[in-house]
A protein has these predicted regions:
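Conserved N-terminal glycine-rich FAD pyrophosphate-binding loop of Rossmann-like flavoproteins
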Residues: 1
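NAD(P)-dependent Rossmann-like dehydrogenase/reductase catalytic/cofactor-binding core
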Residues: 4, 137, 142-145, 152-155, ...
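Rossmann-like NAD(P)(H) cofactor-binding subdomain of soluble oxidoreductases
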Residues: 4, 11-94, 110-112
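Short, conserved active-site loop motifs that form the nucleotide-linked donor/cofactor pocket
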Residues: 7-9, 119
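Catalytic cores of large soluble enzymes that bind and process phosphate-bearing ligands
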Residues: 25-28, 61, 102, 157, ...
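Internal alpha-helical scaffold of NAD(P)-dependent oxidoreductase catalytic cores
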Residues: 39, 68-77, 94-181
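General beta-strand structural signal in soluble alpha/beta enzymes
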Residues: 49, 77-81, 121-125, 253-255
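Glycine-rich beta-alpha junction loops
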Residues: 54, 81-87, 103, 125-130, ...
Length: 279
């Protein structure tokens, strides 16, 4: 059984842990993030986000995790994302990730912190592209789960899904880099891993196979399939789906939109048939 290394210390008071540190890694479910941000002080810290959630501000605009943290604090926020299963990291399998930053000096510091013999990182100044890859690839993985055991269709969905990921990201933040999506570990690499092994994909498979496809099933499946673990994937589906609907982008992003309809609307059955037959 795996154990934490001896230099890892646990605190019951989050503020004590933060006050003792100058680099903070945030890896919590996104639906709890704002509540926690209101209770802590991250000013003048280096913050590394592993959170794969998207938010909507008071004006109805999309906000990424890094952007949300920067709304609360004067701090330098970095995004770390890549194709990594915790069990594989624990085995010290060769792995990689992408560090998304706004300045190279901080990026090099974080790279030095994470790099070792089996874990390699690459730096990019496309922080927003890295974040959007992490958010949107989880939605495509939900679609893969809906398809079930159809390998040819899954390959088609991944290919077209990657294109929709990049096109939608350009609409949200027009300075994202194509390289981030098609050549980086956080893009095509993480998309592949998540679509094969991701928890969202597993959850979606059970969701589509249930007798009644209903949005209320998501929380029930988290309890039964994931033993109560909370994941952001289906919540991100809802936010992105409503965004596409609001902006009349339905025909530009049929994969994202049909995944949303299966997950959160009364048109689930019809949309599931469409997804399986009209990719």
């Amino acid at each position: 059984k795996s154990k934490f290394p001896s230099n890892v210390k646990a605190y019951t008071n989050i503020n004590i842990a933060i006050n003792k540190s100058n680099i903070i890694i945030i890896a919590i479910p996104g639906n709890f993030l704002e509540e926690i941000l209101k209770k802590i002080d991250l000013n003048n810290k280096i913050v590394i986000s592993l959170v794969k959630s998207v938010f909507v501000d008071q004006t109805g605009e999309i906000v990424t995790t890094c952007e949300l943290i920067e709304k609360y604090f004067q701090t330098n926020v970095i995004c770390l994302s890549g194709p990594n299963l915790y069990s594989s990291l624990d085995n010290k399998d060769l792995s990689e990730a992408t560090i998304g930053v706004n300045d190279l000096e901080t990026g090099n510091l974080v790279k030095k912190l994470f790099n070792n013999d089996f874990f390699k990182t690459q730096i990019t100044l496309d922080r927003c592209g890295v974040e959007l890859c992490g958010i949107l690839k989880n939605i495509i993985a939900i679609g893969v789960g809906f398809l079930g055991n159809k390998p040819n269709s899954v390959a088609l969905l991944i290919r077209k899904g990657l294109n929709e990921m990049y096109k939608l990201s350009l609409k949200l933040r027009n300075n994202v880099s194509k390289h981030t999506f098609y050549e980086s570990s956080c893009g095509i690499g993480d998309l592949y891993l998540t679509c094969v092994f991701g928890r969202g994909k597993i959850l979606a498979k059970h969701y589509s196979e249930s007798n009644i496809i209903d949005s209320s099933n998501w929380e029930k499946l988290e309890e039964t399939i994931l033993c109560g673990m909370k994941i952001p994937d289906h919540h991100n589906v809802k936010i992105i789906g409503k965004l596409i609907e609001k902006n009349c982008w339905i025909h530009e992003f049929p994969i994202f939109y049909n995944i949303y309809k299966i997950s959160w609307t009364n048109d689930s059955e019809k949309s599931l048939i469409y997804l399986k037959r009209n990719l």
